[in-house]
Design a protein with these regions (language model features):
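N-terminal metal-binding scaffold of metallo-dependent hydrolase/deaminase domains
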Residues: 1-41, 53, 369-374, 389-390
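C-terminal cap of metal-dependent C-N hydrolases
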Residues: 7, 11, 339, 358-404
Length: 404
């Protein structure tokens, strides 16, 4: 048993702050959370005055198999699976080094995300818990076709979905619209699947108790994804051939459905402003702010691994994305919520992580300072626990101690 004490404990639930709090941990699980002394005695006590303990952060949209460079299709396609798996492991290590204890990998080839997920759980590699989607379902020659999930009609969609689930997928990913990085594929403002075919994906996922993440930039794709019953809409940019065109009526439809939206907000946006001008960034910030005002349940996810506008979006840049939410008008407490407990629910793991409470995994971070007052304090990591294992701790060799 071990106890971690801090000046503040943020449980992840809105408004729940424990001053001079402590967490009692037994192995991989949280036993209790409360004020100092509530956990009784323990063999190990870590006292962190001047620090805040909060749930481990969650990145709801990553691509561990990409290298954060331009044109991952050309660059990574010739790479062997053996080499790519090592690249994914390094990206996972960088991600957890930023305080991310759970991520959702929304697109990988050859079921490599499953291999890495299981290796991390076994203690053979260092990284966050991975919610793995495996091969995205897409039309022939569609967005991310090269990952192996091409399917054009209902029988083919069911086959790919069932193969992914048989392999061990934690969720399914479907490309409801085109995208930005697949040469020759439909553009982002074009719909790839209508409501009925998207509903097939949802049915197959539900048959195994899983959810669906739908990549959707186009207005029609966003609407169809929500009508089909997906768990999360990814990007949700309201894209048209002339750029972002926010649709308030469609946003209200999304909000009323209760569907989560991961707008893939990342810190690269600031460098895009410097290199491409303010118009695109300001339009996107306005869209993110408008979705909040509409009552849409947004969650944190960075699309890490995919270069944006020619600028690398690394897996260790997570906090920069949260700071963009702040620029869009979100308060710090709300940002912590959408990066922890709300993101966990969106990813389908809210029963086991995302908040600090008895019975959940001991996934937590400790930072010097108070992120409720200064969001940048999330960069001041003193401790990262993944299922109770220290993968980052100031003054401690976690490179060897975290791998059994």
């Amino acid at each position: 048993m071990r106890i971690i004490r801090a000046a503040k404990v943020l449980t992840g639930h809105p408004g729940e702050v424990i001053a001079d709090g402590e967490i009692l941990i037994d192995g991989s699980k949280i036993v209790s959370v409360g004020p100092r002394g509530s956990g009784g005695d323990a063999a190990e006590v870590l006292d962190l005055p001047g620090h805040t303990v909060l749930p481990g952060l969650i990145d709801a949209h990553v691509h561990l198999g990409f290298d954060a460079k331009v044109d991952p299709v050309t660059r990574r396609s010739p790479e062997s699976d053996h080499h790519l798996l090592l690249r994914m492991a390094e990206n996972a290590r960088k991600l957890v080094s930023a305080g991310v204890t759970t991520c959702r990998d929304l697109g990988s080839r050859g079921f490599l995300d499953l291999a890495l997920r299981d290796a991390i759980e076994e203690g053979l590699a260092v990284g966050p818990h991975i919610v793995a989607a495996t091969r995205p379902i897409t039309i022939t020659g569609g967005h991310c076709w090269y990952m192996g999930g091409e399917a054009d009609d209902e029988p083919a969609i069911r086959r790919v979905a069932r193969e992914n689930l048989r392999a061990g997928a934690d969720c399914l990913k479907v490309m409801a619209s085109g995208g930005l990085m697949t040469p020759g594929a439909p553009p982002s403002w074009a719909q790839q699947y209508g409501t009925e075919l998207l509903r097939v994906v949802v049915e197959e996922a539900a048959s195994r108790g899983k959810g669906v993440a739908a990549h959707a930039h186009a207005h029609a794709a966003i609407r169809s994804a929500v009508e089909a019953g997906v768990r999360t809409v990814e990007h949700c940019t309201f894209f048209t051939p002339s750029g972002h065109q926010y649709d308030a009526e469609l946003a209200d439809f999304v909000a009323d459905s209760g569907t989560y939206v991961c707008p893939t907000v990342h810190g690269v946006l600031w460098r895009m402003r410097e290199s491409h001008g303010p118009e695109m960034l300001d339009a996107w910030l306005n869209t993110v702010a408008a979705m909040r005002e509409a009552g849409i349940r947004l969650v944190a996810g960075t699309d890490a691994g995919f270069a944006t506008a020619g600028i690398a979006n690394r897996t260790d840049g997570y906090i920069g994305g949260l700071e963009v939410f702040a620029q869009a008008g979100y308060g710090n407490a709300e940002i912590v919520e959408l990066a922890t407990v709300r993101a966990a629910d969106a990813c389908g793991v809210g029963e086991v992580t995302g908040s600090l409470e008895a019975g959940k995994r001991a996934d937590l971070i400790a930072v010097a300072g108070d992120p409720l007052s200064r969001l940048a304090d999330l960069r001041n990591l003193a401790l990262v626990l993944v299922s109770g294992r220290s993968v980052t701790q100031a003054g401690v060799d976690t490179v060897t101690s975290s791998v059994d």
